[in-house]
UniProtKB/Swiss-Prot annotation:
Residues 664-741 are annotated as: Disordered. Acts as a component of the mcm2-7 complex (mcm complex) which is the putative replicative helicase essential for 'once per cell cycle' DNA replication initiation and elongation in eukaryotic cells. The active ATPase sites in the mcm2-7 ring are formed through the interaction surfaces of two neighboring subunits such that a critical structure of a conserved arginine finger motif is provided in trans relative to the ATP-binding site of the Walker A box of the adjacent subunit. The six ATPase active sites, however, are likely to contribute differentially to the complex helicase activity. InterPro entries: AAA+_ATPase, MCM, Mcm3, MCM_CS, MCM_dom, MCM_lid, MCM_N, MCM_OB. Belongs to the MCM family. Coiled coil: none annotated. It is found in: Nucleus; Chromosome. Residues 664-673, 727-741 have a biased composition (Basic and acidic residues). Component of the mcm2-7 complex (RLF-M). The complex forms a toroidal hexameric ring with the proposed subunit order mcm2-mcm6-mcm4-mcm7-mcm3-mcm5. The heterodimer of mmcm3/mcm5 interacts with mcm4, mmcm6, mcm7 and weakly with mcm2. Interacts with mcm7, though this interaction may not be direct, and remains in a complex with mcm7 throughout the cell cycle. Component of the CMG helicase complex, composed of the mcm2-7 complex, the GINS complex and cdc45. Residues 295-502 form the MCM domain. GO terms for cellular component: chromatin; CMG complex; MCM complex; nucleus. A motif (Arginine finger) lies at residues 477-480. This is Maternal DNA replication licensing factor mcm3. It is an enzyme of class 3 (hydrolase).
C-alpha cells in the first residue's frame, strides 16, 4: 500500500520504528517518555514535539518531516499510539488516533502568508500572522454506525477527506439504505465526531510591503486546536500546506485553493501576567520598605521619563494603572474600581505621548482614536457570518480590553452618538446588546484614558472651563479626574523642556548601529516558534533603576533615579493583588472634605471648576485613596492616602490645590498673630511720636487718662499721615512700568470683572469699581490705564472713548 509520499509498507514500518526509538527514551534522558506519561495523566491525545530534538537524534528523519510531512506524520502518530499502548493499553483504546504537534526551528519553512508558494506544498511550515476570522465550531463525522431493523445487522463506515492526513479520501455519501434497499438507522451514540473550525490569518501590517494589501491564508483546526485563538490574536501556526481542488459548475478547475492543516497553534500576544521569581518579589518588598515615605512620588516621577513635568497627571496615571477595589453588593449593584482619566489641553503638550506610554506599561491596553472609532466599534457589533448566514456578535475595543485600559486619542472628534455608547461601559463595566434577536451582556471592566483638544482648538482663558471643554456633564461626571493641560509661555520652563527634548533626540539605544534606524516596534526576526534567548531573559536579574546615561538623565548633578519600566510593570502587578480596607479615620476625612468641595463649588458659582462635583466625586476619592494604599503595599487605607487623593481631586477640579491654605498649624497661626501684633505696636509707637510732636505745638487740652480719645486721635493722625505717603508712592509706581506680578493680578481681576458683568464691553469708571471691589491692594487709575494700554498693544482688549472692549 502506498501512503501518499511514495512510502511502501516496509518504509513506513522503518520510519515508525525510528520514531518509536526517539519517543521511548526512558533509558536516555526520559524527556519524551515523561511527556507521554503527562499526556496520559492530563487525558489528552496530542503530544508537542520539538524538531530540534528530532534533528539532534535523527537528522534524516527531521529533514524528511519538513519536506514530506504527510507520510512522516502518519508514521509518527502510529509510533506514538504504540508507545501509549505499551504504557497504558486501556487509555490507547479510548481514542481513534493520537496527534503530534511540532515546534522549534523551521529555517526556510518559517514563512508569512505572502511567502507561501507552490514549492512548499506537502511541507511542514510555520506561518506567522494575525487571526482575522474564526468560524463557528462544528462537529465533523469520523465514523458512523448504522443499524438495519430488517436484517438486524449493523454497518460501520469511516470518513476521510482532503483535510485529513489520509492519502485517498473516502466517499462522502452518507448511507441511508443497505445493498437490499433496506432503510438504515444511524446510531448517534456509537458514531464518532470531532470538532472542526476554519480560521483565516493575515500577515502582520508591519511586515507587509508598503502600499500593498496584506495577504491571508485559511487554516483548518481540528479537535483540541479549536478555539485556541480569537480574532485579533497574533499567532504562529505550524501545519502541513495542502491544496484542494475547487469545483465550479460540477467540474474541477485548474486552479487550486490552498489551506494549512494545523497541528500546533502558539499565541505570540503579550502575556497578561509577567513571570516572577522569588528574587523579584524580594526586591519589590525591599524597594517598598526603603522608600516607604516617598514611594508614590518616586514611582510617579519614573512614569514616562521622556516627558518633562506633568507631575499630577503622572500621579493620576499611576493610580489608574493600580485601580481601586471593585465591589459587587448582595443586591447585585456593582461599584466600579476602575479609574477613568481625561486630558484636555492645547496641542503639543504631550497628551498622546502619555497615552503611548500607558500602552507599553499596562498589561492589557487597546489603542483607539476618535475619528477612527464608532460606537459599535468600541462596544460590540452584530454581524452576519458569510459562510452560514447566521448572526454573530463581534466584540469591540472596550470588551477586548476587559480588566485593562482603553486609550482613546482625539476624544473630542467623536460624534455625540458614539460618545453616548460608552456611558454604560464607563460606569457599569458592561455592554448590553439587544439587536437582531440577540440579547447579550458582555463584560467591559476597563479603565478609560482619553485625550482631547478644547472646543476652540486652543484653550480660551477668558471663558469658563466648562465652555472650553464642551462635553456633556453626564459624560464628564463618569471621568474620575479631568486635567486641563495648558501651553503656558514661561522662559525658564521652555528652556528646561528644550534641553529635555534635545537630550531625547541625542539619546540612542545600546547596540544601535551608526546611521541605521530600526523600524518602529520591530526587532530581529527569529525563524523559530520559541526564542532561544527567552530563558536568559527570565533568568537575568531584575534591574530596579535604569542605567545612568548623561543624555537620558541630564547633565545636572541630581540624585534622582529613574525606575525601569520592567520593574514598574512587575511592581504594579504585585500591588494590584492587595485589597486595602478603609479605616474610620480616612472615611471621616473623606466625607468632611467632600462636603467642603461641594461648598466651594457652590460659592464660586461653577465658574472655576472643570467638571461637575457630584456624588461620583466621593467614590473617586475612595478609589484614589485605595490606589495610593496599594502603592504603599498597605492593607488599610489611612488618612495620608485620603490626603493625597484629595490633592489630586482638587487639582483636577479647580486647577489648584485648595488644601494648602488649611494646612497651617497652631504654631504658624500663633507666630502670624504675634507678627501682626508687633507690626501694629510699632505703627502705634511711630504715630504716637508724631502725634506727641503735634500735641506739643498745640494747646494741651487732651485728657491723658481718656484712652478712647487718645486711640481715636492716634488712628486719625495715623491715617492722615499715611494716606498722602501711600498716594505719593503709588503715583511714583504708576509712572514706572508695572511689575509682572501686578500685571498678572490685573488680568485676573479684569477677567473676573467681565464675567461678573456678563458683557463684552465695560466703561473704565465701572471697571475700576469692579476691579477694586474686595481687593486688599486696589489699583490706581494710572495703573489701570497703563495695564490697558499694554493689553491693547497685545490685541487682547480695545479701549475707545473710555469703554473697554474684550477681543
Amino acid at each position: 500500500m502506498d501512503y501518499g509520499g511514495g512510502f511502501e509498507d516496509h518504509e513506513l514500518r522503518e520510519a515508525q520504528r525510528e520514531y518509536l526509538d526517539f519517543l521511548d527514551d526512558d533509558q536516555d534522558q526520559g524527556l519524551y517518555h515523561g511527556k507521554v506519561r503527562d499526556m496520559i495523566g492530563s487525558n489528552e491525545h496530542r503530544l508537542i514535539v520539538n524538531l530540534n530534538d528530532v534533528r539532534r537524534k535523527n537528522d534524516k528523519r527531521a529533514n524528511l518531516m519538513l519536506n514530506d510531512a504527510f507520510a512522516e506524520t502518519i508514521a509518527f502518530q502510529r509510533a506514538l499510539k504504540d508507545l501509549v499502548a505499551s504504557i497504558d493499553a486501556t487509555y490507547a483504546k479510548q481514542f481513534e488516533e493520537f496527534s503530534v504537534g511540532f515546534e522549534g526551528s523551521f529555517g526556510s519553512k518559517h514563512v508569512s502568508p505572502r511567502t507561501l508558494t507552490a514549492s512548499l506544498l506537502g511541507s511542514l511550515v510555520c506561518v506567522e500572522g494575525i487571526v482575522t476570522k474564526c468560524s463557528l465550531v462544528r462537529p465533523k463525522v469520523m465514523r458512523s454506525v448504522h443499524y438495519c431493523p430488517a436484517t438486524k445487522k449493523t454497518l460501520e463506515r469511516k470518513y476521510s477527506d482532503l483535510t485529513s492526513l489520509e492519502a485517498f479520501p473516502s466517499s462522502s455519501i452518507y448511507p441511508t439504505k443497505d445493498e437490499e434497499n433496506n432503510p438504515l438507522e444511524t446510531e448517534y451514540g456509537l458514531s464518532t465526531y470531532k470538532d472542526h473550525q476554519t480560521l483565516s490569518i493575515q500577515e502582520m501590517p508591519e511586515k507587509a510591503p508598503a502600499g500593498q494589501l496584506p495577504r491571508s491564508v485559511d487554516i483548518i483546526a481540528d479537535d483540541d486546536l479549536v478555539d485556541k485563538c480569537k480574532p485579533g490574536d497574533r499567532v504562529q501556526i505550524v501545519g502541513i500546506y495542502r491544496c484542494l481542488p475547487s469545483k465550479q459548475g460540477g467540474f474541477t478547475s485548474g486552479t487550486f485553493r490552498t489551506i494549512l492543516l494545523a497541528n500546533n497553534i502558539k499565541l505570540m500576544s503579550k502575556e497578561i501576567a509577567p513571570t516572577f521569581s522569588a528574587d523579584d518579589v524580594a526586591k519589590i518588598k525591599k524597594f517598598c520598605k526603603a522608600h516607604s515615605k516617598d514611594i508614590f512620588e518616586h514611582l510617579s516621577k519614573s512614569l514616562a521619563p521622556s516627558i518633562h513635568g506633568h507631575e499630577y497627571i503622572k500621579k493620576a496615571i499611576l493610580c489608574m494603572l493600580l485601580g481601586g477595589n471593585e465591589k459587587v453588593l448582595e443586591n447585585g449593584t456593582r461599584i466600579r474600581g476602575d479609574i477613568n482619566v481625561l486630558l484636555i489641553g492645547d496641542p503639543s503638550v504631550a497628551k498622546s505621548q502619555l497615552l503611548r506610554y500607558v500602552l507599553h506599561t499596562a498589561p492589557r491596553a487597546i489603542p483607539t482614536t476618535g475619528r477612527g472609532s464608532s460606537g459599535v466599534g468600541l462596544t460590540a457589533a452584530v454581524t452576519t457570518d458569510q459562510e452560514t448566514g447566521e448572526r454573530r456578535l463581534e466584540a469591540g475595543a472596550m470588551v477586548l480590553a476587559d480588566r485593562g485600559v482603553v486609550c482613546i486619542d482625539e476624544f473630542d472628534k467623536m460624534s455625540d452618538m458614539d460618545r453616548t455608547a460608552i456611558h454604560e461601559v464607563m460606569e457599569q463595566g458592561r455592554v448590553t446588546i439587544a439587536k437582531a434577536g440577540i440579547q447579550a451582556r458582555l463584560n467591559a471592566r476597563c479603565s478609560v484614558l482619553a485625550a482631547a483638544n478644547p472646543v476652540y482648538g486652543r484653550y480660551d482663558q477668558y471663558r469658563t472651563p466648562m465652555e472650553n471643554i464642551g462635553l456633556q456633564d453626564s459624560l464628564l461626571s463618569r471621568f474620575d479626574l479631568l486635567f486641563i493641560v495648558l501651553d503656558k509661555m514661561d522662559a525658564d520652563n521652555d528652556q528646561e523642556i528644550a534641553d529635555h527634548v534635545l537630550r531625547m533626540h541625542r539619546y540612542r539605544t545600546p547596540g544601535e548601529q551608526d546611521g541605521y534606524a530600526l523600524p518602529l516596534g520591530c526587532s530581529v526576526e527569529i525563524f523559530a516558534t520559541d526564542d532561544p534567548n527567552a530563558s536568559d531573559v527570565t533568568d537575568q536579574e531584575l534591574q530596579i533603576y535604569e542605567k545612568h546615561d548623561n543624555l537620558l538623565h541630564g547633565p545636572r548633578k541630581n540624585k534622582s533615579k529613574i525606575v525601569s519600566m520592567q520593574f514598574i510593570r512587575k511592581y504594579i502587578h504585585v500591588a494590584k493583588l492587595i485589597k486595602p480596607v478603609l479605616t474610620s479615620e480616612a472615611a471621616d476625612y473623606i466625607s468632611q472634605e467632600y462636603a467642603k468641595i461641594r461648598n466651594h463649588d457652590q460659592i464660586n458659582n461653577d465658574s472655576a471648576r472643570t467638571m461637575p462635583v457630584t456624588a461620583r466625586a466621593l467614590e473617586t476619592m475612595i478609589r484614589l485613596s485605595t490606589a495610593h494604599a496599594k502603592v504603599r503595599m498597605s492593607k488599610t487605607i489611612e488618612r495620608q492616602d485620603a490626603e493625597t487623593a484629595l490633592e489630586l481631586v482638587q487639582f483636577a477640579y479647580f486647577k489648584k490645590v485648595l488644601a494648602k491654605e488649611k494646612k497651617k498649624t497652631d504654631k504658624d497661626l500663633h507666630d502670624e498673630n504675634l507678627s501682626q501684633d508687633t507690626l501694629s505696636q510699632e505703627s502705634v509707637r511711630k504715630s504716637s511720636r508724631r502725634a506727641g510732636k503735634i500735641a506739643d505745638s498745640q494747646d494741651d487740652s487732651m485728657d491723658p487718662y481718656s484712652f478712647s480719645e487718645q486711640d481715636s486721635s492716634l488712628n486719625e493722625n495715623l491715617s492722615q499721615s499715611l494716606r498722602p505717603q501711600r498716594k505719593k508712592a503709588e503715583s511714583q509706581d504708576g509712572k514706572r512700568s508695572l511689575s509682572q506680578n501686578r500685571t498678572k493680578e490685573f488680568k485676573a481681576a479684569l477677567l473676573k470683572a467681565f464675567k461678573s458683568s456678563r458683557s463684552q464691553s465695560v466703561a473704565v469708571s465701572q471697571l475700576l469699581e469692579l476691579i477694586n471691589k474686595g481687593n486688599p491692594e486696589p489699583f490706581e487709575r494710572s495703573e489701570v490705564k497703563e495695564a490697558l494700554d499694554n493689553m491693547q498693544n497685545d490685541n487682547q482688549v480695545m479701549v475707545s472713548e473710555d469703554v473697554v472692549f474684550l477681543i
